[in-house]
């Protein structure tokens, strides 16, 4: 069963500003924030390290939006919005992933993240 579908915005260094803007607009709270420099083995420069790897904005305990920055210059203007589909079980997630993978392009393989 799908628990939620959440818009996931990707930016080229503007995720912090967008997160602050939507936090104010929707009177929401930041419930999760990770930066590139926090990842194991990070070897980028300080500017890249301060970019948002993943952030969650929620209201009334429900996720509104997810945010992230890319590595500088790697943002494709046509791919700035994705949908994160949250399943109630891992088995349902894997089943959907396998079926979608048959005709789609896997950008990120199944892995533990946030």
Regions found by a protein language model. Name each.
Residues 59-63, 71-114:
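Vicinal oxygen chelate
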Residues 3, 51-53, 79-81:
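Residues that flank catalytic or metal-binding motifs in active/ligand-binding sites
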Residues 7-9, 83:
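A structural signal for short, well-ordered beta-strand segments
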Residues 9-62:
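Core segments of cupin and vicinal oxygen chelate
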């Amino acid at each position: 069963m799908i628990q939620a579908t959440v818009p996931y915005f990707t930016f080229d260094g503007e995720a912090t500003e967008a997160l602050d803007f939507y936090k104010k607009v929707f009177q929401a709270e930041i419930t999760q924030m990770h930066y590139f420099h926090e990842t194991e083995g990070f070897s980028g420069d300080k500017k890249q390290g301060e970019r948002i790897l993943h952030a969650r904005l929620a209201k009334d305990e429900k996720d509104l939006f997810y945010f992230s920055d890319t590595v500088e210059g790697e943002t494709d203007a046509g791919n700035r919005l994705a949908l994160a589909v949250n399943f109630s079980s891992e088995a349902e997630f894997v089943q959907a992933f396998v079926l979608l993978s048959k005709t789609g392009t896997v950008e990120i393989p199944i892995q533990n993240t946030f």
